[in-house]
Structure formats: structure tokens, C-alpha cells
UniProtKB/Swiss-Prot annotation:
It is an enzyme of class 6 (ligase). Homodimer. The tRNA molecule binds across the dimer. This is Serine--tRNA ligase. L-serine binds at residues 229-231, 283, 383. Gene3D superfamilies: Bira Bifunctional Protein, Domain 2 (3.30.930.10), Serine-tRNA synthetase, tRNA binding domain (1.10.287.40). Consists of two distinct domains, a catalytic core and a N-terminal extension that is involved in tRNA binding.
Amino acid sequence: MLDMKFIRENLETVADMLKRRGTEAPLDEFKELDEKRREIIQEVEQLKHKRNVVSSKIGELKRAGEDASDIIAEMKEVSATIKKYDEELRGIEERLQQVVLSIPNMPHDSVPVGEDEDDNVEVRRWGEPRKFDFEFKPHWDLGEALDILDFERGSKVSGARFTFLKGAGARLERSLISFMIDHHTQNGYTEIFPPFMVNSDSCIGTGQLPKFAGDMFKVEGTDYYLIPTAEVPVTNLYRDEILNAEDLPVYHVAYSACFRAEAGAHGRDTRGIIRQHQFNKVELVKFVHPDKSFEELEKLTRNAEEILQMLELPYRVVTLCTGDLTFSSAKTYDIEVWMPAYDTYREISSCSNFKDFQARRAGIRFRPEPGAKAEYVHTLNGSGLAIGRTVAAIMENYQNEDGSITVPEVLRPYMGMDVIKP
């Protein structure tokens, strides 16, 4: 959430930001509501001052034995007017809050201006895509032939975009989760195992609500939402709290199942496990001093990259342009892994700096020193990594001519095998 004072004083700047993002927000309504709110507050303050002054006068008249009935009647009218204004003010402030919550974050100056993913800027590459000397297969064909992915039964039991992982496929998924968490905890992240359902306040805190309610699964008749990412519960771990400056930075890593409606993905990635309603992910979340957040973003991205390097999977890093930037982010790097069946790089991690956008929504602050005014922390998060897409990338990049899949060396202690065979 942007600071209301900042929006008021920089309406043109915010309007320009929305244009660069290729989106809209009701700034005219914000201006109208904000002006009306300030007028009412000023009027109420004047009425309260008048009531206080006249209340003293009523006391003087009563002590003098004089009639104060007219002034008392006038004060009742003033009190009724104040009550009416207070009710109007509550309605205005509620709507104003909704308007402010609908305005996205300001992109950092280093974010390239562009319309969509075609305007994202490549930063670096690691590894060379494998050149196959046989006709390679997509992961969905490999998985069915090896009997480690069962799409038909996933669809029967749940519906489209659900999959059973079986045998070595399930073990590969579990091994990746353990490997990733082990690596990140060695890098100073504290492991968290979060709830997979959260309330609406948590979703507002990280920016999923109110704008993206259609992308989430809500438990009917409750205030519970299935989490789209562990970012939501882990960021809200410190909601409405004040951290000590000496405790910053705070690093957390969390495994969770993730649940997404994929409302805008009709017809995209209908085969395989690239785009599922339920998938597993290891998430990295940071709470840092505002002066350090962009430095911490570089470290976070490198931490996610290390996983792909250890798995020896080719990838590239791109900076998202303004038109492709997520709602809450000030700057995002996407890490994209090479997928032979798609003949391109596909996103496997997004690493973002939200600055104080989420912290302001969630009320997460820190005290620079004892007795000092509390300030908002900066929050960051990134996938470290998406498990299903990592499984798919391993299957496609490590496949053999006989249909088997070589297990990456770093995973063999977790898997207890070198090759997944038919």
C-alpha cells in the first residue's frame, strides 16, 4: 500500500506510474474522497472546539443560577451534527482505504519500461542447453511411460490441472523439497512450516486481496483462503508487530502446498505439470532494513540460482518490465529454467523487493533504536524453487534415450538411486 500522503502530494507521478504499468486505479475518486475527508475532519474539529467552549459557559451559567436551556439545546444539535459527520467520515474512510488498496506499488527506477513479458530484459545466463543426439520427449510423456505421473487419475479424482505423482516421481518431489530447505537453512534462513489456510487480513497484507480474489480458492462460509504461496502466511507472521533493529535482517524459508485458480490461464499449459491448481513450492521471505533491501534482493536471487546450479540445470535471469511487474512489487527478477520440450526458458522463480508496500498494509515495523519512532520494514520474497517445475525440468533435461531419467548427482543421497528406470 502506498502512503496516502505520498499519493495526495504526487497524483501526477502516481498516474504516470499506472500508465507505465499498463493499468488503472480510481485516482479521481481518491482525490475527491481525500478532499471530502479533510473537509469533514476540519469541520468536526471546529464543532468540537465550539462544544468545549460552550460547555464551559453552560457550567458558568448554572453556577450563577441563570437559564442555560437554549445553549444546552444548541449543544445537542452540535453533538448530533458531529455524530452525523462521524458516520459520514467512517464511510468515506472505508471507501478511501479500498481505493488506496487498489493502487499498485511504484516500480523502482531501475525497472525497464515495457508493456509485457516481451519487454523484459535478460540479465545473465548460466549453463548451456543440452544438445540431444536422440528424439527427446516432453516430461508428460516421460512421466506416463515411467508410471511416475498419472494425469488421468488426477483428473478423475479432482479435475483438470491436478496430477498424481507416484513411486520415484513422488520421491523426487519430496527429495527436492528436503534438498532445497537444507541448502537455504545453511545460508542462514530459519525454516518455517506455515498454515496452508489464512484469513482475509493476511491476504490484504501481502496484496492478494481485494484485487485478486478471483485467483484464490476461498472456503465457503468462512474467512479462510487456501494460500497461493507461502509468502502469504510467512510475511504475515509479523503482522501488526514492531521488530527490533538489531534483529534485522530476518530470513525465513518455508515449504508449502500452493493453490491457485489460474482463472486467466484457460488453454495455456494444459499438458504436464507446469501449471497446476495445486503445487508445491519452497519460498524465501526476508524482512530487512529499508537501506538494505535492493542489496538483499540480489542476495535472494543468487540464493535461488544456487539451487539450479547445484542441479546443473541451464537457466537465465530477466528483469521484469513495468507492464509485467506484479501488483505489490517494486522490482522483480524472474529465473527461467531451460525446458527442451518447449524449446525455451520457463519461469521457475520470481524474486521481488516490495519495499514498504506489504509492510504498510500488514503493519510490520521496526524500531531503529530504543525510544525512536517505529518505521516500516522492507519485505522481499522469492521461490527457492517451484517444486513441480523443477521436477519437469529435471525429467526433460536429464532424460536418456531408453526413456530413463538420470538423477542429478546432488539429489542421489536424498533419492537413494542414480536413475529412474522404466
